[in-house]
Amino acid sequence: ARVWSAFNILSNGWFTFDDGNGNMITKDAYAYVDYAMGHNPENRMPLWIKPAKKVTVKNVADVMRDHYEGTPMDMTTDIGAGGNALPYRWRPMDFEYNGKTYTNERAIATQQTGFWFVGQSRGDFPDVIGGLIWFGTDDAATSYLTPIYTNTNRVPECFREGNGNLLTYSNTSSFWINNRITNACYRMYNIMAPYVRERIDAFENEQMVKVRENDNKALDLFKQAMDGAEKKGKKASVAYDVMSDTGSSFSAVKSLLTKYSVDTAQEMFK
């Protein structure tokens, strides 16, 4: 069901796929909803589909926030949602009614999430710049992703090991702050969650722009390092430094990426 819902979102409701004979065909996503809901296991949906458009980091992140909204499995509309359209069903997932056992569907976004992320490997950038992990903590539906360059050499305080744990609260921990927000939303979901989502979208869209700006600054520093190395005949050793934790050739690039990653992660506490 979760795969069907993700496909449904990314294809705008139309599954385009190879029929196994080399032919690309398109079918309404709802042609397979009975399979997704477990009513017709013989009506197998395709293993993969072609998205309606190029998939962005934001697209993937938003899929991970899904609770089947707008589908027959929409968890905000059945009796289990209560009076505040809560799209969560607490464990255990099954229940009995009139002698029959029923099971609540598992959504993509879920309350027991510790952390979540979207990895972005950008081959059109040098290795020292191209890797990004958009990282978040607690429930994906009520937390935002912050960009962390993979060459960052310092851990933000909010993600630091030892800054709180599962049983020890810390008001400087990303997990605990997001956990507070999430639990507040669970009490009045239809009132609070839309406001939180608005703030999430604003932050993530802003960072998409800032990442591009930061990339350009990092590229300038990278080119300066490469030009300087070439003049000194040290291009090979510089190439090694790209992936070395101790390499100094790209120290300016790494410092820039680290500062941006750490400062951005800490913005939630401002």
Model segments located where?
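C-terminus-biased signal that marks the final domain/tail of proteins
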Residues: A1-K270
